[in-house]
Amino acid sequence: MDRIAEAFVWPVRDPDWLTKILIIGLINVIPIVGAINGLGWMLASMDRLRSGEEKLAPANFSYLGRGARVFVVYLIYGLALVALGLLPYIPAIAIAVSQNHTNGNAGLIGLALLLNLVAFAIFTLGSLLLTFMLPALILATDRGGIAAGLRVGDVLRRSTANPMNTLIAGLMLIAASFVSSLGVIACFVGVFFTAAYALAMQAWIIRSFEIGSAAPKAG
């Protein structure tokens, strides 16, 4: 429980946390560039955690290069998931469109529904899988570059080496995503703040995963 709580509260230990969060939040508004810089800032904040300094990285535009690698890798994984989901979805739509309301074939309509369910399952389960793989994926990319992040086997091996560690990290990332969305729920008033705060949380979560995956198993 302490591990979970720390992810939420560690950013405020930095005396300048509010200013840094707001600046990164404003930078995040810039399409694509903001997201890339935010990822790099998250990694730089994680570096500070590695050094034992519980302070957020300075808020500026200096993290584009580092964040770009993670952005590219995650984009490739996302596009692969979309392509996989479209394999059953496109035939489902084609079959459904080919059936008119008066002379539709019940078997074909049933097949279209089944294919739609398969596509939905692929998108849903694939998104969850990506979430739970994210800590290992980010660490691999940050250390070894884009090629390392795309070594699916290595990423999966690290993710499954300590299932409980991966489960906790994945659930915490889902919680961080919820925090990020709170600004949208509040009519976009706090979206700048909550999105950047979620990035700070992710730095702690991924660092915590890194420590857990490096620790030797008992027994």
Explain the meaning of each model-derived region.
Residues 78-89, 172-189:
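Alpha-helical transmembrane segments and their membrane-interface junctions
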Residues 2-15, 53-68, 150-160:
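A short amphipathic helical element positioned immediately N-terminal to and/or at the very start
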Residues 11-18, 67-78, 158-170, 174, ...:
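Loop-to-transmembrane-helix entry motif
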